From Swiss-Prot:
The keyword Transport applies. The modification N6-acetyllysine is found at residues 94, 204. Keywords: Acetylation, Membrane, Methylation, Mitochondrion, Mitochondrion inner membrane, Phosphoprotein, Repeat, Symport, Transit peptide, Transmembrane, Transmembrane helix, Transport. It comes from Mus musculus (Mouse). It is found in: Mitochondrion inner membrane. It catalyses: phosphate(in) + H(+)(in) = phosphate(out) + H(+)(out). The lineage of its organism: Eukaryota, Metazoa, Chordata, Craniata, Vertebrata. The modification N6-methyllysine is found at residue 107. The modification Phosphotyrosine is found at residue 191. Inorganic ion transporter that transports phosphate or copper ions across the mitochondrial inner membrane into the matrix compartment. Mediates proton-coupled symport of phosphate ions necessary for mitochondrial oxidative phosphorylation of ADP to ATP. Transports copper ions probably in the form of anionic copper(I) complexes to maintain mitochondrial matrix copper pool and to supply copper for cytochrome C oxidase complex assembly. May also play a role in regulation of the mitochondrial permeability transition pore (mPTP). Belongs to the mitochondrial carrier (TC 2.A.29) family. SUPFAM superfamilies: Mitochondrial carrier. This is Solute carrier family 25 member 3. It holds the Pfam family Mito_carr.
């Protein structure tokens, strides 16, 4: 499967569309003979500096590694905030706000108590990041080749949504067991303090169901979140380079490009938090309680209940998403991976729409 995907990816429209236009000679007739030759020479040099080919197995593997770092490290870094957010969701009478939640946690558990659940967070979200970013690149290449160059451009937002949803479906299966353990450790005082204590206890009480009963609500939370995360990020980057950044992306330094990545990531993160928060509340309560179903929890929480802890989640997810995209893009820069620019309208489509002479 992966070999066929790699073969398709080499020809897909996201594989450096700017360079492809020059190579095909589509922009040649309007330029003197010398500049096009120089452009082709520079384009070739740019391709040669990459450590691997776009769509190759090495490319996808390194993208997955970037996902491991971006998701695993960032989620672990905000464990204290995540812990307070989860406790606000499952016990709103006791934890009435962010600062109140931190105060109570410090008083009852001490500073070390704020780090509860760091191990399942690191393991679970590293596995999720591997699948999320790695499979996103795979599905985006696969779907774009099915659509063709013109439809890929016209339906690019739908492409981002479909690719990210497909990737997140598999990513959540990898995340679910560790997410269940994390919530138990963070929200049930005295249940377990470490991952090694929680896993055997959960298995003894409920079997495998303890680890996967939350996968459906996890899909409810994470798939809309990831669809918004990737689609909003891709379109925001495109808009920033088009309307905000005063020069073309090709003329920006790597550092300037990474700043654009961070800003676009934060904007995407705010929308992600809002879209996914109700399901996040259900997941937190469901993993705390034994024998409950998602529909029962949703009915009990009500409309106001599912929005508890939203402000904390906006701060956490906005920062998380910005850092994740920054780290992911930095990994691509460090390993010299192909980083195609935002898509441009194909010349064939411009001619059909009468935008060229």
């Amino acid at each position: 499967m992966f070999s066929s995907v790699a073969h398709l990816a080499r020809a897909n429209p996201f594989n450096a569309p700017h360079l492809q236009l020059v190579h095909d000679g589509l922009s040649g007739p309007r330029s003197p003979p010398a500049p096009p030759r120089r452009s082709r020479h520079l384009a070739a040099a740019a391709v040669e500096e990459y450590s691997c080919e776009f769509g190759s197995m090495k490319y996808y593997a390194l993208c997955g590694f970037g996902g491991v770092l971006s998701c695993g490290l960032t989620h672990t870094a905000v464990v204290p905030l995540d812990l307070v957010k989860c406790r606000m969701q499952v016990d709103p009478q006791k934890y009435k706000g962010i600062f109140n939640g931190f105060s109570i946690t410090l008083k009852e558990d001490g500073v070390r108590g704020l780090a509860k659940g760091w191990a399942p967070t690191l393991i679970g979200y590293s596995m999720q990041g591997l699948c999320k970013f790695g499979f996103y690149e795979v599905f985006k290449a696969l779907y774009s080749n099915i659509l063709g160059e013109e439809n890929t451009y016209l339906w690019r937002t739908s492409l981002y949504l479909a690719s990210s949803a497909s990737a997140e479906f598999f990513a959540d299966i990898a995340l679910a067991p560790m997410e269940a353990a994390k919530v138990r450790i963070q929200t049930q005082p005295g249940y377990a303090n470490t991952l090694r204590e929680a896993v055997p206890k959960m298995y003894k009480e409920e079997g495998l169901n303890a680890f996967y009963k939350g996968v459906a609500p996890l899909w409810m939370r994470q798939i809309p979140y990831t669809m918004m995360k990737f689609a909003c990020f891709e379109r925001t980057v495109e808009a920033l380079y088009k309307f905000v950044v005063p020069k073309p992306r090709s003329e920006c330094t790597k550092a300037e490009q990474l700043v654009v990545t961070f800003v676009a990531g934060y904007i995407a993160g705010v929308f992600c938090a809002i879209v996914s928060h109700p399901a996040d509340s259900v997941v937190s309560v469901l993993n705390k309680e034994k024998g409950s179903t998602a529909s029962q929890v949703l009915q009990r929480l009500g409309f106001r209940g599912v929005w508890k802890g939203l402000f904390a989640r906006i701060i956490m997810i906005g920062t998380l998403t910005a850092l994740q995209w920054f780290i992911y893009d930095s990994v691509k820069v460090y390993f010299r991976l192909p980083r195609p620019p935002p898509p441009e309208m194909p010349e064939s489509l411009k001619k059909k729409l009468g935008l060229t002479e």
